[in-house]
From Swiss-Prot:
Single GO molecular function: magnesium ion binding
Location(s) in or outside the cell: Plastid, Chloroplast
Keyword Ribosomal protein included in the entry's annotation: no
Species of the source: Salvia miltiorrhiza (Chinese sage)
Record keywords: Chloroplast, Isomerase, Magnesium, Metal-binding, Plastid, Transit peptide
Name of the protein in its database record: Ent-copalyl diphosphate synthase, chloroplastic
EC numbers for this chain: 5.5.1.13
Binding site for Mg(2+): 372, 374
Role of this protein: Catalyzes the conversion of geranylgeranyl diphosphate (GGPP) to the gibberellin precursor ent-copalyl diphosphate (CPP).
PANTHER family in UniProt: ENT-COPALYL DIPHOSPHATE SYNTHASE, CHLOROPLASTIC (PTHR31739:SF4)
């Protein structure tokens, strides 16, 4: 018995815990989905992508697939902890202010880079060119004598920052007390270098630290230079320097320009031709400061002077970071489920990125001659989602011999770079082979890292990177319902505790901050409280309509509402959400009740066609329940928006009833219901005739119905192992191709296009079918409990 004939049917009690097979998909070497063994409630989808929820606070037990809720506890808890509405408004205003004030990027100061700037002498050579940098160093030493990130202790970060600051102060014979404390910290802790996780080694650390030690020796600073950890660092340095192609370094822009301060034998006349437009060397203050020391170049001086003014004496480890900030802020807000509050600001962020998009990709800053796969993948994904035309061929610049890389010549692969490539590759259009290859490569890389428990990244120390990667691998984008992703990301996002790794640890306050997280938690709990009230209303409607007498279980009821609420969660979309849920519930009831009787089907259709309003006001028949529900939905829309949808809605049902015998048509009815019930909220009312005659509407409907029908038939033709038989007739390649075509229709814009919400409705319905086909019943039960009933703490 399949999970469901459509994505709104819940398993009966015998299968609520996964006793019967449910198919799972896994990505094949060709980049498409293939059938594999069924998932169980303890399989990777449930255990790796998502941790066990704290459902004991709200759920006694799952009986017959239905969470038994302690409603009184929820009500009391809400009353105690609910924040006032003005708190949400206050947080929205604060976040909006951040987004509107975005410029070159908000970023923390790097003591290491500031020290290199402080080392620069003026034209006469006997005074510091930038005394404000020395002042910053002198006023930002930590209590233990070190310099570095105040909240996260990394010995890599503390040692290189502290040694650089000690060197800078000593070179100008300033603050001997502070240098003494710094030296003591280094002596006490330098042995810990061998204990640190090498994945968190800062950029260029193995070259920069030995260079600083050499300078320290010249200044007669007494620090250890022969510990086991340092010997390993020096060995890494030799390997890296041998890999550096001197001719290429001086001929074309490479990532080596970011770390010039650690390299010997540089030919500055050639290197100056490779400066960025802003006068920097690949946006690195320390590299640029070293260049200024060696060349006295005016453009280097101008770059550093401008940023010293902005940061009041300090400098970051990299600047600007405008594209990085714009992209990652949008990504975080979307995944946290609060992007709807900031649509104008998000549109501006995405438009800003598009202004600097190139056919070779982008990096963290505008107008760069160097591109990286991380920023390019994030940019590609968000631009495509927002309707911009971006070619998948951009990823050909990051592929060689079937492998993908972040930078040419990189020494190690970053987990987050491959993670964002994997996410981007799922927005594939038909025929984009490069994205199939990218998905295959990145998925394999991430799966191997997960299997080896190596999901650490060289660019960020975050709260739960394994959870983020696990969710992406186990719940592909086609199956990822918005509220499900948000519910788990709320536990994975670390807010201001997440810290990035560059030449030193650094923070991006407009990307990682607690205001985003606090707003998202409040918003989620507010939406969840509304959903729980709607669920109680659905239960009351179910009882009053006697749907249980017609064979509909309460398990089917909760899944129908859950799928709708997890897809359309916004409070202002309550009417669409309830219309989706009730439509799905009635379809399931009618289909199952008349499954074995063709004569009963004909009678039902005849009664529906010839029904008059008064006759069915109180009768407890399926026809009566259906007519009363349509009347109520239509009346709700009329009162709220002044739109008459009763006849079009009844027409849609009539079409479905005539065709349901073949098992199809459910997706079309759901889409039509959503578009009719949601039309009143848009700026203009889209009539049934206008919608149905629009060429793109017809294409979207055909694509949606086609792929949903394949997914429905796929579920019905699984064999006892949860896998398709050889003659099943449904190729997963066809389903993937159908989803790709639908995504292209939904996200691309054209003259005279449909309203974006109408287009999104098609994808939401297809995604719900995909979700039902992909997830096993145990996982769905788990999601229901967590998304609908587990409050975010």
């Amino acid at each position: 018995m399949p999970l469901a004939s459509n994505p709104v049917a819940f398993l009966p009690s015998s299968t609520a815990h996964g006793d019967l097979p449910a198919a799972a998909f896994s990505r094949s070497s060709a980049g498409c989905l293939q059938l594999c063994r069924p998932l169980t409630p303890t399989s990777s989808l449930q255990c790796n992508a998502i941790s066990r929820p704290r459902t004991e606070e709200y759920i006694d037990v799952i009986q017959n697939g239905l969470p038994v809720i302690k409603w009184h506890e929820i009500v009391e808890d809400d009353a105690e902890k609910d924040s006032p509405k003005d708190k949400v408004g206050e947080l929205r205003d604060a976040v909006r202010s951040m987004l509107r004030s975005m410029g070159d990027g908000e970023i923390s100061i790097s003591p290491y880079d500031t020290a290199w700037v402080a080392l620069v002498a003026d034209a006469d050579g006997d005074r510091p060119q930038f005394p404000s940098s020395l002042h910053w160093i002198s006023t930002n030493q930590l209590a233990d004598g070190s310099w570095g990130d105040h909240a996260t202790f990394s010995i890599f970060d503390r040692i290189i920052n502290t040694l650089a600051c000690v060197v800078a102060l000593t070179s100008w014979d300033l603050h001997p007390d502070k240098t003494h404390k710094g030296i003591l910290f280094i002596k006490k802790n330098i042995h810990r270098l061998e204990e640190e996780n090498v994945e968190h080694m800062p950029i260029g650390f193995e070259v920069a630290l030995p260079s600083l030690i050499d300078i320290a020796k010249q200044l007669q600073i007494d620090i250890p230079s022969d510990t086991r950890g340092l010997r390993e660092i020096y060995a890494r340095r030799e390997i890296k320097l041998k890999k550096i192609p001197s001719d290429i370094l001086h001929q074309m822009p490479t990532t080596l320009l970011h770390s010039l301060e650690g390299m010997p034998g540089l030919m500055w006349q050639k290197l100056l031709k490779l400066q960025s437009e802003d006068g920097s060397f690949l946006f690195s203050p320390s590299s640029t400061a070293f260049a200024l020391q060696q060349t006295k170049d005016h453009n280097c001086l101008k770059y550093l002077t401008n940023h010293l003014i902005k940061f009041k004496g300090g400098v970051p480890n990299v600047y600007p970071v405008d594209l990085f900030e714009h992209l990652w802020a949008v990504d975080r807000l979307q995944r946290l489920g609060v992007s709807r509050y900031f649509q104008p600001e998000i549109e501006e962020c995405v438009a800003y990125v598009y202004r600097y998009w190139t056919e070779k990709g982008i990096c963290w800053a505008r107008n760069s001659e160097i591109q990286d796969i991380d920023d390019t993948a994030m940019g590609f994904r968000l631009l495509r989602l927002h309707g911009y035309e971006v070619s998948a061929d951009v990823f050909k610049h990051f592929e060689s011999g079937g492998e993908f890389f972040c930078f040419k010549g990189q020494s190690t692969q970053a987990v987050t770079g491959m993670y964002n490539l994997y996410r981007a590759a799922q927005l594939i259009f038909p025929g984009e082979n490069i994205l199939e290859d990218a998905a295959t490569f990145s998925a394999k890389f991430l799966q191997q890292k997960r299997a080896n428990n190596e999901l650490l990244d060289k660019w960020i120390i975050t709260k739960d990177l394994p959870g983020e990667v696990g969710y992406a691998l186990d719940v592909p984008w086609y199956a990822s319902l918005p509220r499900v992703e948000t519910r788990f990301y709320l536990e994975q996002y670390g807010g201001e505790d997440d810290v990035w790794i560059g030449k030193t640890l650094y923070r991006m306050p407009y990307v990682n901050n607690n205001k985003y997280l606090e707003l998202a938690k409040l918003d989620y709990n507010n939406c969840q409280a509304l959903h729980q009230q709607e669920w109680k209303d659905i239960q009351k409607w179910y009882r009053n309509s006697s749907l249980g007498e017609f064979g509909l279980s309460e398990g089917s009821l909760v899944q129908a509402y859950y799928v709708a609420a997890a897809s359309i969660f916004e409070p202002q979309k309550s009417q669409e959400r309830l219309a989706w849920a009730k439509t799905a519930i009635l379809m399931q009831t009618i289909t199952s009740h008349f499954h074995h009787s063709a004569e009963q089907k004909r009678v039902f259709l005849h009664e529906f066609q010839h029904a008059t309003g008064g006759r069915y006001k109180t009768t407890r028949t399926l026809v009566g329940t259906l007519l009363r529900t349509l009347n109520q939905l239509s009346l709700d829309i009329l009162l709220a928006h002044g739109c008459h949808i009763h006849q079009p809605l009844k027409n849609a049902w009539h079409k479905w009833i005539k065709t349901w015998e073949g098992g199809g048509g459910g997706a079309e009815l759901l889409v039509q219901t959503l578009n009719l019930c949601g039309g009143g909220r848009r700026n203009r009312w889209e009539s049934e005739e206008l919608l149905s005659s629009h060429p793109k509407y017809e294409h979207l409907l055909k694509a949606t119905v086609g792929v949903c029908d394949k997914l429905r038939r796929f579920q019905h033709r699984k064999d006892c192992n949860g896998c398709m038989g050889s003659d099943g007739g449904i190729r997963m390649l066809d389903i993937e191709a159908g989803m790709q075509e639908l995504v292209k229709l939904v996200v691309t814009k054209s003259p005279g296009d449909l309203d974006s919400e109408i287009k999104q409705n098609f994808f939401m319905i297809a995604r719900s079918y995909y979700y039902a086909a992909y997830c096993n019943p145990g996982t769905i039960n788990f999601h229901i409990a967590k998304v609908l009933f587990e409050r975010v703490q």
